[in-house]
Regions:
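Alpha-helical linker/hinge and terminal dimerization helices associated
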Residues: 43-44, 65-87
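Short helix-boundary/capping micro-motifs
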Residues: 11-29
């Protein structure tokens, strides 16, 4: 099962281009991020990266996974926003009054 944090890490790698830059932005170690990327490949059951001597890059499947992950994260944020707005409306008391008008 994939969690939202793994998807967030995948999209950060897509934005930053390197594991070290992405790990720095995420405030995690590079080996931790590398393990997450390996875990995602295992969960998906496909290769997401082209690995070089000291470099890792997305292959086409990896770019597609990152694109979809971005959409899922945005949708997750939208769900949070809607639920919070609903809760506020449910627990908001509206008081209306009418000020008396002068009679002269």
């Amino acid at each position: 099962m994939i969690d939202l944090e793994e998807l967030r890490q995948l999209t950060m790698f897509a934005r930053e281009g390197t594991l070290s830059k992405a790990a720095e932005k995420l405030h995690i170690s590079q080996p931790t991020l590398s393990r997450t990327m390996q875990n995602l490949e295992e969960v998906f059951g496909v290769s997401l990266f082209v690995r070089g001597k000291n470099k890792i890059e997305f292959n086409e499947t990896g770019w597609k996974a990152a694109e979809r992950a971005e959409h899922l994260l945005a949708e997750g944020e939208e769900v949070l926003r809607h639920v919070r707005e609903f809760y506020k409306r449910l627990h908001t008391i509206t008081v209306e009054s009418c000020a008396p008008a002068p009679l002269w």
